[in-house]
Amino acid sequence: MSTINTDTSEAMPHISVNAQYIKDLSLENPSAPSSLAALDQRPQIDLSLDINITNLSEENFYEVELNIEAIARNEKYKLFQIELKYAGVFNLINIDSEQHPILLSVHCPAMIFPFARKIIASCTQDAGFQPLMIDPIDFGALYHKKMSEHQN
């Protein structure tokens, strides 16, 4: 028989997701319906991603916002442009403040990214295109690249 320690004074460090939400969503389908007839070729996708972190007024509560923009083009048309700001509110519980930057820049975005990816796939499909399935993102590599750029 095992027992579970419910004493919160010695609670294990963890990240709590308090909320997830769409802050802003825009989809443009500027060349429809002509562009929908030209779907026999694979479009070129230009993708950009940015992460914004805001320390909320409460202690150890942060908003982590993913800003994702994708533009699809073929030889003739700009097929679509989608912009999504998707955020989560995170509480870093019993975690040393020195670890906050990497957790907020790597682990928190990785937790909410699948939801943002699904929204983009659904919206592009609803616009008449194949769903845009964004490849998984290595937030750790992005963080380390950004840190090395700041040091130079």
Swiss-Prot record:
Keyword Protein transport belongs to the record: yes
Cell location: Cytoplasm
Main location as per UniProt: cytoplasm
GO molecular function, one term: unfolded protein binding
Record-level GO cellular component terms: cytoplasm
Gene Ontology process terms (BP): protein folding; protein tetramerization; protein transport
Gene3D superfamilies recorded: SecB-like
UniProt keyword Cell inner membrane present: no
Cited Pfam families: SecB (PF02556)
UniProt entry keywords in alphabetical sequence: Chaperone, Cytoplasm, Protein transport, Translocation, Transport
Disulfide feature: none
Family per record: Belongs to the SecB family.
Function: One of the proteins required for the normal export of preproteins out of the cell cytoplasm. It is a molecular chaperone that binds to a subset of precursor proteins, maintaining them in a translocation-competent state. It also specifically binds to its receptor SecA.
Assembly description: Homotetramer, a dimer of dimers. One homotetramer interacts with 1 SecA dimer.
Full protein name: Protein-export protein SecB
Organism: Rickettsia prowazekii (strain Madrid E)
Gene: secB
